[in-house]
Amino acid sequence: MCHQKLTISWFAVVLLASPLMAIWELEKDVYVVEVDWSPDAAGERVVLTCDTSEEDDIIWTSDKNSEAVGSGKTLTIQVKEFSNAGQYTCHKGGKTLSHSRLLLHKKENGIWSTDILKDQKDPKNKTFLKCEAANYSGRFTCWWLTAISTDLKFNVKSSSSSSDSRAVTCGAASLSAEKVTVDRKDYQKYSVACQEDITCPTAEETLPIGLVMEAQHKYKYENYSTGFFIRDIIKPDPPKNLQLKPLRGSQMELSWEYPDSWSTPHSYFSLKFHVQVHRKRERKDESQFVDKTSATIRCSKGAEVRVRAQDHYYNSSWSRWVSVPCS
Protein backbone atom coordinates (compact mmCIF):
# COMPACT_ATOMS: atom_id res chain seq x y z
CA MET A 1 0.00 0.00 0.00
CA CYS A 2 2.79 2.43 0.95
CA HIS A 3 4.69 1.53 -2.21
CA GLN A 4 1.65 2.33 -4.37
CA LYS A 5 1.17 5.76 -2.74
CA LEU A 6 4.81 6.67 -3.26
CA THR A 7 4.68 5.65 -6.93
CA ILE A 8 1.57 7.75 -7.62
CA SER A 9 3.07 10.80 -5.86
CA TRP A 10 6.33 10.54 -7.82
CA PHE A 11 4.57 10.45 -11.18
CA ALA A 12 2.37 13.39 -10.15
CA VAL A 13 5.46 15.51 -9.45
CA VAL A 14 7.01 14.57 -12.79
CA LEU A 15 3.86 15.36 -14.75
CA LEU A 16 3.46 18.70 -13.01
CA ALA A 17 7.11 19.71 -13.16
CA SER A 18 7.83 18.85 -16.78
CA PRO A 19 5.62 21.54 -18.38
CA LEU A 20 6.89 24.12 -15.90
CA MET A 21 10.50 23.40 -16.78
CA ALA A 22 9.95 23.68 -20.54
CA ILE A 23 9.40 27.44 -20.45
CA TRP A 24 10.41 29.94 -17.77
CA GLU A 25 10.77 33.69 -17.40
CA LEU A 26 14.34 35.00 -17.68
CA GLU A 27 13.39 38.63 -17.15
CA LYS A 28 10.30 40.76 -17.71
CA ASP A 29 8.63 39.75 -21.01
CA VAL A 30 11.57 37.45 -21.94
CA TYR A 31 11.04 33.68 -21.77
CA VAL A 32 13.38 30.75 -22.28
CA VAL A 33 11.96 27.68 -24.02
CA GLU A 34 13.93 24.49 -23.38
CA VAL A 35 13.90 22.44 -26.57
CA ASP A 36 14.93 18.88 -27.35
CA TRP A 37 17.06 19.24 -30.51
CA SER A 38 16.62 15.67 -31.76
CA PRO A 39 15.09 15.45 -35.29
CA ASP A 40 11.97 13.57 -34.20
CA ALA A 41 11.18 15.82 -31.21
CA ALA A 42 7.75 17.45 -31.32
CA GLY A 43 8.90 20.71 -29.75
CA GLU A 44 7.27 22.61 -26.91
CA ARG A 45 3.75 24.01 -26.91
CA VAL A 46 3.83 27.62 -25.71
CA VAL A 47 0.74 29.71 -24.98
CA LEU A 48 1.23 33.49 -24.92
CA THR A 49 -1.38 35.74 -23.31
CA CYS A 50 -1.85 39.37 -24.28
CA ASP A 51 -1.49 41.61 -21.22
CA THR A 52 -4.76 43.51 -21.59
CA SER A 53 -8.32 43.56 -20.35
CA GLU A 54 -9.49 43.65 -23.96
CA GLU A 55 -11.01 40.45 -25.36
CA ASP A 56 -11.88 41.13 -29.01
CA ASP A 57 -10.16 42.27 -32.22
CA ILE A 58 -6.66 41.42 -30.98
CA ILE A 59 -4.07 40.36 -33.53
CA TRP A 60 -0.56 38.94 -33.06
CA THR A 61 2.54 39.71 -35.12
CA SER A 62 6.09 38.41 -35.07
CA ASP A 63 9.35 40.20 -35.81
CA LYS A 64 10.01 37.41 -38.32
CA ASN A 65 6.73 37.76 -40.20
CA SER A 66 5.20 40.92 -41.65
CA GLU A 67 1.71 39.39 -41.60
CA ALA A 68 -0.48 38.48 -38.63
CA VAL A 69 0.42 35.14 -37.03
CA GLY A 70 -2.74 34.80 -34.94
CA SER A 71 -5.73 36.49 -33.34
CA GLY A 72 -7.44 36.49 -29.96
CA LYS A 73 -6.19 37.12 -26.45
CA THR A 74 -3.94 34.05 -26.51
CA LEU A 75 -1.52 32.73 -29.12
CA THR A 76 -0.41 29.08 -29.20
CA ILE A 77 2.97 28.31 -30.78
CA GLN A 78 4.71 24.99 -31.32
CA VAL A 79 8.34 25.89 -30.64
CA LYS A 80 10.78 23.47 -32.23
CA GLU A 81 13.52 25.54 -33.88
CA PHE A 82 14.93 29.06 -33.98
CA SER A 83 12.46 30.15 -36.66
CA ASN A 84 9.76 29.78 -33.97
CA ALA A 85 11.61 32.02 -31.50
CA GLY A 86 11.55 35.80 -31.56
CA GLN A 87 9.41 38.71 -30.45
CA TYR A 88 5.63 38.27 -30.47
CA THR A 89 3.47 41.38 -30.11
CA CYS A 90 -0.29 41.75 -29.64
CA HIS A 91 -2.12 44.76 -31.11
CA LYS A 92 -5.57 46.24 -31.30
CA GLY A 93 -6.54 48.98 -33.73
CA GLY A 94 -2.91 49.80 -34.49
CA LYS A 95 -2.01 50.11 -30.79
CA THR A 96 0.60 47.83 -29.22
CA LEU A 97 -0.78 46.12 -26.11
CA SER A 98 2.11 43.91 -24.96
CA HIS A 99 4.92 41.74 -26.25
CA SER A 100 6.83 38.59 -25.34
CA ARG A 101 10.30 37.55 -26.46
CA LEU A 102 11.05 33.82 -26.80
CA LEU A 103 14.61 32.48 -26.56
CA LEU A 104 15.62 28.86 -27.21
CA HIS A 105 17.83 26.78 -24.95
CA LYS A 106 18.61 23.66 -26.90
CA LYS A 107 19.51 20.23 -25.57
CA GLU A 108 21.06 17.72 -27.94
CA ASN A 109 21.68 14.10 -26.90
CA GLY A 110 20.98 15.10 -23.31
CA ILE A 111 23.57 17.90 -23.30
CA TRP A 112 22.79 21.62 -23.17
CA SER A 113 24.40 23.63 -25.95
CA THR A 114 27.60 25.62 -25.34
CA ASP A 115 27.95 27.34 -28.69
CA ILE A 116 28.30 30.97 -27.63
CA LEU A 117 31.49 30.77 -25.54
CA LYS A 118 34.92 29.40 -26.39
CA ASP A 119 36.08 26.42 -24.36
CA GLN A 120 39.38 27.53 -22.80
CA LYS A 121 40.52 23.90 -22.54
CA ASP A 122 41.35 23.25 -18.92
CA PRO A 123 43.26 19.92 -18.81
CA LYS A 124 40.68 18.33 -16.46
CA ASN A 125 37.37 19.57 -17.85
CA LYS A 126 35.70 22.14 -20.06
CA THR A 127 36.34 25.66 -18.84
CA PHE A 128 34.36 28.57 -20.26
CA LEU A 129 34.79 31.10 -17.42
CA LYS A 130 38.13 31.91 -15.83
CA CYS A 131 38.40 33.95 -12.64
CA GLU A 132 41.24 35.64 -10.73
CA ALA A 133 41.55 37.52 -7.45
CA ALA A 134 44.43 39.88 -6.64
CA ASN A 135 43.89 39.46 -2.88
CA TYR A 136 41.59 37.96 -0.23
CA SER A 137 39.12 40.88 -0.07
CA GLY A 138 36.39 38.89 -1.85
CA ARG A 139 36.72 40.94 -5.02
CA PHE A 140 37.57 39.05 -8.20
CA THR A 141 37.35 39.29 -11.98
CA CYS A 142 36.06 36.68 -14.42
CA TRP A 143 36.44 36.60 -18.18
CA TRP A 144 35.41 34.54 -21.18
CA LEU A 145 35.96 34.35 -24.93
CA THR A 146 33.57 34.29 -27.87
CA ALA A 147 33.96 34.30 -31.64
CA ILE A 148 30.65 36.16 -31.97
CA SER A 149 30.84 39.94 -32.33
CA THR A 150 27.21 41.16 -32.42
CA ASP A 151 23.81 40.64 -30.75
CA LEU A 152 25.29 39.45 -27.45
CA LYS A 153 24.10 39.87 -23.88
CA PHE A 154 25.70 38.50 -20.71
CA ASN A 155 24.67 38.39 -17.06
CA VAL A 156 26.77 36.92 -14.23
CA LYS A 157 25.26 36.18 -10.82
CA SER A 158 25.40 33.83 -7.83
CA SER A 159 24.31 30.33 -8.75
CA SER A 160 22.49 29.82 -5.44
CA SER A 161 20.28 32.00 -3.28
CA SER A 162 20.28 29.69 -0.25
CA SER A 163 21.23 31.15 3.13
CA ASP A 164 24.31 28.94 3.50
CA SER A 165 25.84 29.97 0.15
CA ARG A 166 28.38 32.72 -0.40
CA ALA A 167 26.42 35.58 -1.97
CA VAL A 168 28.17 37.53 -4.70
CA THR A 169 27.25 40.69 -6.59
CA CYS A 170 28.64 41.16 -10.10
CA GLY A 171 28.66 44.25 -12.28
CA ALA A 172 27.87 44.54 -15.96
CA ALA A 173 29.97 42.59 -18.44
CA SER A 174 32.32 44.71 -20.55
CA LEU A 175 34.08 44.07 -23.84
CA SER A 176 37.86 44.25 -23.61
CA ALA A 177 39.91 46.08 -26.20
CA GLU A 178 42.19 43.05 -26.11
CA LYS A 179 41.72 40.50 -28.88
CA VAL A 180 42.72 36.94 -28.07
CA THR A 181 44.01 34.62 -30.77
CA VAL A 182 43.68 30.86 -30.29
CA ASP A 183 44.71 28.42 -33.03
CA ARG A 184 44.93 31.34 -35.49
CA LYS A 185 41.37 32.43 -34.77
CA ASP A 186 40.48 35.76 -33.13
CA TYR A 187 38.10 35.94 -30.17
CA GLN A 188 36.39 38.76 -28.32
CA LYS A 189 37.22 38.91 -24.61
CA TYR A 190 34.56 39.93 -22.08
CA SER A 191 35.08 40.43 -18.36
CA VAL A 192 33.10 41.21 -15.23
CA ALA A 193 34.08 42.35 -11.73
CA CYS A 194 32.41 40.63 -8.77
CA GLN A 195 32.42 41.18 -5.02
CA GLU A 196 31.46 38.77 -2.28
CA ASP A 197 28.71 40.41 -0.21
CA ILE A 198 30.08 39.36 3.20
CA THR A 199 33.82 38.79 3.54
CA CYS A 200 36.22 37.67 6.24
CA PRO A 201 39.66 37.43 4.60
CA THR A 202 41.29 35.69 7.58
CA ALA A 203 38.64 32.97 7.91
CA GLU A 204 39.07 29.48 6.48
CA GLU A 205 36.90 28.97 3.39
CA THR A 206 34.50 26.04 3.80
CA LEU A 207 31.96 26.81 1.06
CA PRO A 208 32.89 27.57 -2.54
CA ILE A 209 31.60 30.57 -4.45
CA GLY A 210 29.16 29.50 -7.17
CA LEU A 211 28.52 31.55 -10.29
CA VAL A 212 26.27 31.19 -13.30
CA MET A 213 26.69 33.20 -16.46
CA GLU A 214 23.66 33.62 -18.73
CA ALA A 215 24.46 34.28 -22.37
CA GLN A 216 22.15 35.41 -25.16
CA HIS A 217 22.94 35.56 -28.85
CA LYS A 218 20.02 36.69 -30.97
CA TYR A 219 17.34 34.13 -29.97
CA LYS A 220 19.70 31.60 -28.41
CA TYR A 221 20.06 31.23 -24.64
CA GLU A 222 22.81 29.33 -22.81
CA ASN A 223 24.16 29.25 -19.28
CA TYR A 224 27.56 28.36 -17.91
CA SER A 225 28.48 27.69 -14.30
CA THR A 226 31.65 27.60 -12.25
CA GLY A 227 32.61 27.22 -8.61
CA PHE A 228 35.79 27.98 -6.67
CA PHE A 229 37.38 29.08 -3.43
CA ILE A 230 39.05 32.50 -3.43
CA ARG A 231 42.32 30.83 -2.42
CA ASP A 232 42.25 28.80 -5.64
CA ILE A 233 41.98 31.83 -7.94
CA ILE A 234 44.54 34.08 -6.22
CA LYS A 235 47.02 35.73 -8.57
CA PRO A 236 48.88 38.60 -6.89
CA ASP A 237 49.70 41.77 -8.75
CA PRO A 238 53.44 42.07 -9.49
CA PRO A 239 55.83 43.59 -6.94
CA LYS A 240 56.43 47.33 -7.25
CA ASN A 241 59.27 49.85 -6.93
CA LEU A 242 62.18 47.64 -8.01
CA GLN A 243 65.54 49.24 -7.14
CA LEU A 244 69.15 48.20 -7.61
CA LYS A 245 71.90 49.19 -5.15
CA PRO A 246 75.60 48.49 -5.92
CA LEU A 247 77.52 46.34 -3.43
CA ARG A 248 80.92 45.05 -4.55
CA GLY A 249 82.09 44.03 -8.00
CA SER A 250 79.14 42.79 -10.04
CA GLN A 251 77.07 42.16 -6.93
CA MET A 252 74.02 44.30 -6.34
CA GLU A 253 71.15 44.40 -3.91
CA LEU A 254 67.74 44.24 -5.55
CA SER A 255 64.83 45.49 -3.44
CA TRP A 256 61.10 45.81 -4.07
CA GLU A 257 57.80 46.32 -2.28
CA TYR A 258 54.55 44.39 -1.93
CA PRO A 259 51.91 45.37 -4.50
CA ASP A 260 49.42 47.93 -3.16
CA SER A 261 46.53 45.59 -3.90
CA TRP A 262 47.78 42.73 -1.71
CA SER A 263 45.92 41.95 1.53
CA THR A 264 47.19 43.32 4.84
CA PRO A 265 48.75 42.86 7.32
CA HIS A 266 51.67 41.41 5.36
CA SER A 267 52.81 39.55 8.47
CA TYR A 268 49.68 37.40 8.06
CA PHE A 269 49.19 37.58 4.29
CA SER A 270 52.77 36.88 3.26
CA LEU A 271 54.17 36.58 -0.24
CA LYS A 272 57.19 34.72 -1.52
CA PHE A 273 59.18 35.94 -4.49
CA HIS A 274 60.97 34.46 -7.47
CA VAL A 275 64.02 36.50 -8.54
CA GLN A 276 65.59 35.84 -11.92
CA VAL A 277 68.58 37.34 -13.72
CA HIS A 278 68.30 36.97 -17.48
CA ARG A 279 71.38 37.31 -19.69
CA LYS A 280 70.80 37.24 -23.43
CA ARG A 281 73.98 35.30 -24.22
CA GLU A 282 73.42 32.62 -21.59
CA ARG A 283 70.86 29.87 -21.99
CA LYS A 284 70.17 29.40 -18.30
CA ASP A 285 68.84 32.16 -16.07
CA GLU A 286 69.98 32.61 -12.48
CA SER A 287 67.05 32.05 -10.13
CA GLN A 288 66.41 32.27 -6.42
CA PHE A 289 63.33 32.16 -4.21
CA VAL A 290 63.12 34.46 -1.20
CA ASP A 291 60.61 35.35 1.53
CA LYS A 292 61.86 38.89 2.11
CA THR A 293 61.68 41.92 -0.21
CA SER A 294 65.33 42.00 -1.22
CA ALA A 295 67.96 39.73 -2.72
CA THR A 296 71.65 39.86 -3.56
CA ILE A 297 72.27 39.20 -7.25
CA ARG A 298 75.11 39.23 -9.76
CA CYS A 299 74.28 41.93 -12.27
CA SER A 300 76.19 42.60 -15.49
CA LYS A 301 75.68 45.04 -18.35
CA GLY A 302 72.95 43.96 -20.75
CA ALA A 303 71.30 41.65 -18.22
CA GLU A 304 67.77 42.05 -16.93
CA VAL A 305 66.49 41.34 -13.43
CA ARG A 306 62.87 40.37 -12.89
CA VAL A 307 60.70 39.47 -9.92
CA ARG A 308 57.28 37.86 -9.49
CA ALA A 309 55.18 37.04 -6.42
CA GLN A 310 53.15 34.12 -5.08
CA ASP A 311 51.07 33.50 -1.95
CA HIS A 312 53.55 32.26 0.65
CA TYR A 313 51.29 29.66 2.24
CA TYR A 314 49.14 28.51 -0.66
CA ASN A 315 50.18 27.35 -4.10
CA SER A 316 48.55 30.25 -5.94
CA SER A 317 49.30 31.40 -9.46
CA TRP A 318 52.41 33.53 -9.84
CA SER A 319 52.03 37.21 -10.61
CA ARG A 320 53.26 38.69 -13.85
CA TRP A 321 56.98 39.43 -14.00
CA VAL A 322 58.20 42.97 -13.36
CA SER A 323 61.73 43.81 -14.49
CA VAL A 324 64.56 46.33 -14.31
CA PRO A 325 67.74 46.46 -16.46
CA CYS A 326 71.13 45.91 -14.84
CA SER A 327 72.79 48.77 -16.74
Swiss-Prot record:
Keywords: Cytokine, Disulfide bond, Glycoprotein, Immunoglobulin domain, Secreted, Signal. GO terms for molecular function: cytokine activity; cytokine receptor activity. Residues 1-22 form the signal peptide. The keyword Signal applies. Residues 23-106 form the Ig-like C2-type domain. Residues 238-327 form the Fibronectin type-III domain. It is found in: Secreted. Glycans are attached at residues 125, 135, 223, 315. Heterodimer with IL12A; disulfide-linked. The heterodimer is known as interleukin IL-12. Heterodimer with IL23A; disulfide-linked. The heterodimer is known as interleukin IL-23. Also secreted as a monomer. Interacts with NBR1; this interaction promotes IL-12 secretion. Belongs to the IL-12B family. Cytokine that can act as a growth factor for activated T and NK cells, enhance the lytic activity of NK/lymphokine-activated killer cells, and stimulate the production of IFN-gamma by resting PBMC. This is Interleukin-12 subunit beta.
